[in-house]
Amino acid sequence: MLNQAFLNLIKNSIESINSATENGLLDKNKSYGQVQVDIKTQNNEVCVTILDNGVGLPKNVNRLFEPYVTIKKEGTGLGLPIVKRIIEDHLGSLFLLPGQKMKGCDHSGAEAKIILPTINSKQL
């Protein structure tokens, strides 16, 4: 199930980059779409960050976790609520944040941050 959650978040990043290109935020001749995945472990947690240079997030970003709410032309608005539920079922947290400016890009995209507890062999 976690695989599905991560794939959905990466797919959202790619779709956001495509929208940024269509809307003129990314100039095909000067910049390119980027999805960056970073994984860090600290204490008893693993933090996965997915950063993109797509269109970014709306001001009411938390509404995206509500069923049937979407900012895309296509889709049902169920992806992020399901992703959040999967992560929470694994005792984790999901945050959507404004992204950082990436190399060759004049705007900020979005950042999805997933924090999950680690499991050691004694817990299995």
Segment roles from a protein language model:
Residues 52:
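Acidic ATP/Mg2+-coordinating residue in the GHKL
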Residues 92-93, 99:
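Conserved glycine-rich
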Residues 14-43, 99-106:
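ATP-lid-like helix-loop hinge signature
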Residues 87-88:
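Detector for a conserved hydrophobic position within an alpha-helical segment of the HATPase_c
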Residues 2-3:
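A residue-level detector for a conserved hydrophobic packing site
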